[in-house]
Amino acid sequence: MWRNGIVYRAVKNFVRHNSTNNAAKNLKSIKVEDIQNRIENIPIENYRNFSIVAHIDHGKSTLSDRLLEITGVISKTEGTSGQRVLDKLEVEKERGITIKAQTCSMIYNDKRNGQDFLLHLIDTPGHVDFRDEVSRSYKACNGAILLVDASKGVQSQTVANFYLAYSMGLKLIPVINKIDLNVAEVEKTAGQIESTFEMSQDEIIKVSSKSGINIQEKLLPAVIDRIPPPTGIKNKPFRALLVDSWYDSYLGVVLLVHVVDGSIKKGDKISSAITQMKYEIKEIGIMHPDRVNTGKLTTGQVGYIVPGMKNSQDAKIGDTFMKVGLESQTEILPGFEETKPMVFVGAFPADGVEFKALDDDINRLVLNDKSVTIEMENSNALGQGWRLGFLGSLHASVFKERLEKEYGSQLIITQPTVPYLIEYEDGTIKEVTNPNEFPTNRKAKGVKSIANVQEPYVEAIMTLPDEYLGNVITLCDNHRGKQVEIKYMDSGQSNAIKQVMLRYEIPLFELVDNFFGRLKSVSQGYATLDYEDIGFRPSDIVKLELLINGTTIDAITSILHRSKVNKVGTEWVKNFKKYVKSQQYEVVIQARINNSKIIARETIKARRKDVLAKLHASDITRRKKLLVKQKEGKKKLKMRSIGNIQINTDAYQEFLRR
């Protein structure tokens, strides 16, 4: 049945992010030699490397499926089944979002002139947490489709990703999608595109990704005509940009690269500009949409390399790969930056979950998500666990969901925090990502004096109907936001609902503390949000702790702005009281700031045990002895129980989940 060994290995070894059965069926019909021959005969002038820029749910993945179908990469049945071919993760399909950047090479015959074109589509994430994925993908592109839903209009992620793509010099093609919906407002959306992005309405292409209207007739010709080809030089030494990587249990680390100059083939040796490590290429080819071994890659192409790399941490996204021996003749590509986590949580096994098994599951998941950082952590309340760093709150949520769905593992997650910079008067700076490490006793002998504490800020972009403007402004003000810009997006139609774009500078911590949920609530679900990092700023930051009988519960500790601590501290003690059962002695629950000042308190009175119940009423001597013994026992019990109140793990889980 499988006579072509290359095709067999491609199917057998392909396990990237839960590949589908449909993908395997499609590979059966692929003749690798035909693909190789057609690509060989396509000049670089006929290459088009492009991406799709869109807000979540505007139809980006559906458009990708339709392009794959029209170019013959997948069958019509696969393209219309709603399987979202380039979204490999189960959580991507369930949430309707793209998390990992994916790519697919398509060979398209232009009926206007009969020429073949090699189209490299890179399907990027839209959410701000995965902005690094987006910017890396854009570096491999020369253009992008700016996709806007006709029923929703221009929204925040569209705006943010437009400016990112524009700043990187990509040629943008404005496209209005879902024009066949009954609620589509095509002309209004066209007016918004014109006023927001200063694009002529004559440039706009109107399509339906679902039904395929105008995809082949107008969109694909526009990709060919408007997006320029790659500008690399074939006879220069090989160099390639590392766009993405993933871990394959058979092959090790697989690299997704954009060949900027030169060419490379199986058996060649390459080296990393960042790690200086050298590798021999075991397999090389294109994604179609799964791995197809073509034996080589050349200038302008986007494809995969299997280098025999064992450790996924050695794959530095944005790295430059060169041929061994030609490093001195090869210019390193600019712009490499290590991915930096901006949201941190404590993670602990839920009740009944084995630590070792969960540790193995977390490390397996991190093999395909190098942006997650891991450190071991111990808690007096929850035991041994981990401190995990993520790109954002959605990233953390997706990681937890993947852990539960793919491995069946349950976690207790502490309140998220962000990195803070502690600047000391001697000029040294320390970054703190764990609330328990935040310095409190700043005047103690031998402790370095603190000059200031800085917290990260972001510029938030929100789009919303103007009827909710007052609610959203109030929300932003309550979250320490500073208004930068308010702009009405003119649609050119007098009877249309006016859309407003707001720009605010807001502390990042305020956003990760359920800001998006509150934004949706005050706008009845109509507001959208995107944001970008704008650096650190001095702020009045303190440490808030929860104490039981004078002992800190380290799992319930946070770093907050001083203006928030009284409200949060009062909520903490009232809520936590619900989960502590009465004891044979008084239990005191307190909230404390900076290891010194108590700002809130709740008391659970002692539960009295009737030790006299079984005694005869006239046995006075015995009664007195038992009462004295009970009193002494309470003293001893209370001494043993300070900081050791028996609280079920479920109580912490419920408290932290609220």
UniProtKB/Swiss-Prot annotation:
Q: What class of enzyme is it?
A: hydrolase
GO BP terms: namely:
positive regulation of translation; translation
**Care to name a GO molecular-function term for this sequence?**
GTPase activity
What are the tr-type G domain coordinates in residue numbering?
A: 45-231
State if Chloroplast is listed as a keyword: no
Could you say which EC number(s) this protein's record lists?
3.6.5.-
Gene3D superfamilies on file: 3.30.70.240, Elongation factor 4, C-terminal domain (3.30.70.2570), Elongation Factor G (Translational Gtpase), domain 3 (3.30.70.870), P-loop containing nucleotide triphosphate hydrolases (3.40.50.300), Translation factors (2.40.30.10)
Cystine bridges: none
Q: Which InterPro entries match?
A: EF-4, EFG_III/V, EFG_V-like, G_TR_CS, LepA_C_sf, LepA_CTD, LepA_IV, P-loop_NTPase
Q: How does it sit in the membrane?
A: Peripheral membrane protein
**What does the UniProt keyword field contain?**
GTP-binding, Hydrolase, Membrane, Mitochondrion, Mitochondrion inner membrane, Nucleotide-binding, Protein biosynthesis
- Write down the CDD domains for this protein, in alphabetical order: EF4_III, LepA, lepA_C
Q: Which GO terms describe its cellular component?
A: mitochondrial inner membrane; mitochondrial matrix
| Residues annotated for GTP binding in this entry | 54-61, 123-127, 177-180
Broad class of where this protein is predominantly found: mitochondrion
Q: Among its keywords, does the record have Hydrolase?
A: yes
**Subcellular location(s) per record:** Mitochondrion inner membrane
Catalysed reactions, semicolon-separated: GTP + H2O = GDP + phosphate + H(+)
Purpose: Promotes mitochondrial protein synthesis. May act as a fidelity factor of the translation reaction, by catalyzing a one-codon backward translocation of tRNAs on improperly translocated ribosomes. Binds to mitochondrial ribosomes in a GTP-dependent manner.
Q: Which family does it belong to?
A: Belongs to the TRAFAC class translation factor GTPase superfamily. Classic translation factor GTPase family. LepA subfamily.
Q: What other facts are recorded?
A: This protein may be expected to contain an N-terminal transit peptide but none has been predicted.
State the name under which the record lists this protein.
Answer: Translation factor GUF1, mitochondrial
Annotated source species: Vanderwaltozyma polyspora (strain ATCC 22028 / DSM 70294 / BCRC 21397 / CBS 2163 / NBRC 10782 / NRRL Y-8283 / UCD 57-17)
Q: Which gene encodes it?
A: GUF1
